[in-house]
Amino acid sequence: MRALLSAPGRRPLSPPRALIAALAVALAAPAAAVQMSDVAPMAGMSALAAAQDEAEGASPTAERAVKAAYLYKFLGYVDFPGGPLDPGAPYVVGVAGAEDVAGELARQTSGRMVNNHAVVVRRLHDGDGAAGLHLLFIGAAEGGAEAALVKAAQAAGALSVTESATGIEAGSVINFVLVDERVRFEVSLAAAERGRLKLSSRLLSVAYAVQKGGG
C-alpha cells in the first residue's frame, strides 16, 4: 500500500488523495459471491483499512467515500433470504438520512457490477418502506427513527447498516465506527440471524468487532 501512496519519484499523496487512490484499487476488484475462493475483492476491503492507516486525520469527504465503498463491497459478501438474484435484476441499496453518502455511493457504483448485477441507489424519505431493498444504510441524521428503520430492514430481509453509537443496540447488522479517525465496522451475528442473512467469514475477518449470535 505504501507503494501506491508514495511511488518512487513522486510526492506523497495528501490524506484525502491517498484514500481516493486506495478506493480506486478497492473498487476495481469486482465483488464476488460468498462461496467463491477468489480473495481479490476482500483484499480490496482490506486496502480501505490499510489506506486509512496511512492517511492520518482523513477529511469528512474521505470518510464519506470510504463508507460508500464499504457499502458497495458488503453486497458481495451476504447471502440474502430470497436466494440469488434473477438474471438482469439489480441490487437495490436504500439510503436514509445521509444524502451525501447516497450521492457518493451512486457515483462509485455507476457502471460497476456485483456478481454480474448492477447496483441501484434509492434515496428514502419519510414514510418509505424497505420492501425490495437488499441493503439499507441509515445515516446518523435519522436519529429517533433508527430503530424503526432497522426493524423494517429486518422484515424485508435487507442488510441494515448504521453509523451511530446505538446502531448495534438498535438491531443493526453492521454499524460503522470511527477508531482513531479511521472508518471501521462492527457486526452483530445475532441481528444477521434474525434477518435470515448469512455473512461471509471473509467479511467478518475485516470487521473491527463481531458480536456472536445464538447459534
Region annotations inferred by a language model:
Residues 2-215:
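Short hydrophobic alpha-helices and adjacent helix-cap/hinge residues
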